[in-house]
Amino acid sequence: GLGVVAVTYGAGALNVVNAVASAYAECSPLVILAGCPGEVEAHSGLVLHHQVRSIDSQLRIFSEITCDQVRLSNADTAPEDIARVLRNCREYSQPVLIEIPRDMTLAPMREVPVLAPRSFNQEAVNEAADEWLARIHAAKNPVMVVDVEVRRFGVEARVAELARRLQLPVLTTFMGRGLLAEDGVDLHGTYLGVAGAPETTALLDESDLPVMLGAILSDSNFGVSAQRMDFRRALIAAHREVRVGHHVYHDIPLAALVEALLERIPPQRTGTPRALPPQPDYPRGLVADDTPLCAGDLSRALND
């Protein structure tokens, strides 16, 4: 589904900038319905209440934190504009802005069409899948890394099946923690770099081929590595792009790549997974006493 927020022009819209920027960074689909001045007010020569620098300042600010924007100033083109923006919101899993001028709120218009999914080049998908599998089969220590886009695009079950067929150990990123936790894959926890368990960290740091699905290459996900990570040695599928070294296949949905890979790998008996790292000895047993509260007490309360 999509999140929706309706706000007033200027003050209302600017109050949600931080939340919208977070949604953009974390690939959360969100529709912002924002008011804006009508044609008469926009050309009155007066500075309007809640106007920042110009009438278009709101639109320009949100253009930095949304994947598509539209101002519904024309009732004839509004249905197609709305349909385009909503499709981009779903296909890119990022926020979009729909500005509604005051004098257009009651304007009649045609029904909004439902656009078919954006087309992609199946030959490019097939070529990318072949190149990925060749790299995976040639690697000595491949590891699969899954991130938030796997959940956003609804491919968690298919990615789990891919991990089982490839018999790869799986890590999640910090932003993707909790993914595939109950899907029966060879899951080794969340990669936290120098802050994580050494055995878990070594799986990625020492891998000759990280296979990254839906991975956001951010500092919170990979910036805590003891050494600068060379993503050129990785296979990366995210933001409708598929990367193999210096090769980039544009406009390929994550789901299309996963399906193409599964078509090339027949189901097989599951091999013996590598041993999971030992469970950390988390602090437990909160004692109700008169000593000052500390961070360790909160950890014990949560673990209990």
Annotate each PLM feature.
Residues 56, 78, 84-138, 263-270:
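Conformationally flexible catalytic loops at phosphate/diphosphate-handling active centers
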Residues 1-38, 44, 200, 206-218:
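Thiamine diphosphate
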Residues 38-61, 181-186:
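Active-site-proximal loop->helix
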Residues 73-76, 96, 111-112, 229-304:
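Phosphate/pyrophosphate-binding active-site segments
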